[in-house]
Amino acid sequence: IVCNNNFHGRTTTVISFSTDPGSKDYFGPHTPGFIHIPHGDTIALEDKLKKDKNVVAFLVEPIQGEAGVNVPDPDYLKKVRHLCSQYNVLMIADEIQTGLGRTGSLLASCGNCDCNSSCEQQSSYVRPDILILAKALSGGTYPISAVLCDSDIMEVIQPGQHGSTFGGNPFAASIAK
């Protein structure tokens, strides 16, 4: 499940679930099977989770940036976390545009950081199952990204099963350090 007006990049599968005609219409073929809901709408999320038992994950930007600055209600991510846990669906927070201090907090999703279970942005601590970071990770000086999650998720992919053109780049890692 993804949100309308999302922006998660420009790779083939990601473009497949874009709702921006300028990004999608002349680029394909598209990967099928994505479900769209309005950003900030937990009622729509729960409705889709109830109807489709094959949903694996919900990918969300804590604050949408490409669609304007679309800030959801303060308890939105807390409700998302609860629904994802209730329906055994991974919560994936895409913090590429919002993470690492770009919103005034370490993370806009307020998870996987030392905020003592509270945050100035939200009324409660929210920890996504998967956290995606980039851009600010190197201070904008060199391309680097990171996918953070617990080992029970990460170890589903075994060495050699998946590759990355720029993965494992020691120079980029030293810049991010």
Features from the language model and the residues they span:
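Conserved N-terminal phosphate-binding loop of PLP-dependent enzymes in the Aspartate aminotransferase
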Residues: I1-K177
